[in-house]
């Protein structure tokens, strides 16, 4: 059975690809590093707003301010690249799921006893 995607889902995927490219190569704001990763984009049903979830090695308030400042530039560049009547307003949201996942993995590693290497168990006689 073919899985169908709504138009807003397809637009969100295209915006995610284009924003990743724009953030890496076009944005010159020093607060916005090229290490920003767009993890997901959610577009409203009327396509007037888009939540852009991102992650970065240093997710700081300065980065958030830099992204908000470049939102107009990014929107204008999206208008040139996408065939849409209106380009959604961009709202940037820090995606903390990767940080939470790393913290949980660390807690699991600390809770489990270390696994002995089977090659080191055999003692020479």
UniProtKB/Swiss-Prot annotation:
SUPFAM superfamilies: Ribosome-binding factor A, RbfA (SSF89919). One of its GO terms (biological process) is maturation of SSU-rRNA. One of its GO terms (cellular component) is cytosol. GO terms for molecular function: ribosomal small subunit binding. Pfam families: RBFA (PF02033). The keyword Cytoplasm applies. It is found in: Cytoplasm. PROSITE patterns: RBFA. Keywords: Cytoplasm, Ribosome biogenesis. Belongs to the RbfA family. Monomer. Binds 30S ribosomal subunits, but not 50S ribosomal subunits or 70S ribosomes. One of several proteins that assist in the late maturation steps of the functional core of the 30S ribosomal subunit. Associates with free 30S ribosomal subunits (but not with 30S subunits that are part of 70S ribosomes or polysomes). Required for efficient processing of 16S rRNA. May interact with the 5'-terminal helix region of 16S rRNA. This is Ribosome-binding factor A.
């Amino acid at each position: 059975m073919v899985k169908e995607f709504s138009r807003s889902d397809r637009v969100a995927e295209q915006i995610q690809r284009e924003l990743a490219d724009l953030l890496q190569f076009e944005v010159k704001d020093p607060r916005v590093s090229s290490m920003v990763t767009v993890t997901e984009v959610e577009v409203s049903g009327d396509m007037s707003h888009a939540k852009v979830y991102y992650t970065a090695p240093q997710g700081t308030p300065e980065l958030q301010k830099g992204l908000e400042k470049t939102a107009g530039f990014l929107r204008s560049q999206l208008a040139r690249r996408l065939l849409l009547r209106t380009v959604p307003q961009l709202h940037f949201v820090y995606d903390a799921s990767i940080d939470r996942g790393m913290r949980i993995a660390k807690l699991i590693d600390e809770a489990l006893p270390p696994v002995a290497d089977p090659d080191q168990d055999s003692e020479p006689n």
